[in-house]
Amino acid sequence: MTTAANTKENPVTTTQTVPVRLDFEAHAGGFYKALAHLDQAATKELDKVDFDVRLRELVRIRASQLNGCAFCIDMHTKDARAAGESEQRIYALSAWRETPFFSARDRAALALTESVTLMAGTHVPDADFEQAAAE
C-alpha cells in the first residue's frame, strides 16, 4: 500500500503513531517517573563504558518485541534510526540469529537481552553472562 507518507522515495516514513493504551503518567505517575529515572541511569552507565548507541537501541527494540509493546517498538525504532542504525539491521532484528548483519558483540548483547527479558520461570544462563562479558 502506498500513501503520501509511504512512497518509493521514502518507504518507511509515516505520519501515523502507535496509540497509547494507557497514560502511565496520569494513572501511575510515580511508577512512570521511576521507570524514566531507571532508563536515564542505565543510559548514563552505558555511556560511561562507550556502549554503542545504535546497539543500545537495538537491544531496546528487541526487548520491546519480546514484550509485545508496539508503542516501545515504534519509539525505539525511531531512536535507532536517529542514531544512524541501518534499516537492514532493524528489519532483521527479530531474526538476528539467522542473519550475518550482527557482530559478535551485537549477538552477545542480543542473547543476554533475550535471556533477561524472557527469564520468568527460569534464569539467565551463565553462558549468556559470560559471552556478554567477553565481548
Language-model regions: role of each:
Residues 1-57:
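Acidic, glycine/proline-rich low-complexity segments that act as flexible tails and inter-domain linkers
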Residues 22-24, 52-69, 97-98:
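Alpha-helical scaffold segments that form or flank carboxylate-/histidine-based iron centers
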Residues 25-26, 30, 92-119:
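Short Fe-S-cluster ligation motifs
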Residues 33-37, 68-72, 120-126:
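Short acidic alpha-helix initiation/capping motifs at coil-to-helix transition points
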Residues 43-44, 60, 77, 94, ...:
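Amphipathic alpha-helical segments within well-ordered protein domains
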Residues 52, 86, 134-135:
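Helix N-cap / loop-to-helix initiation motif
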Residues 60-91:
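Conserved alpha-helical segments that form or flank metal/cofactor-binding pockets of metalloenzymes
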Residues 109-135:
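Short flanking/linker segments adjacent to small metal-binding domains or redox-active Cys/His motifs
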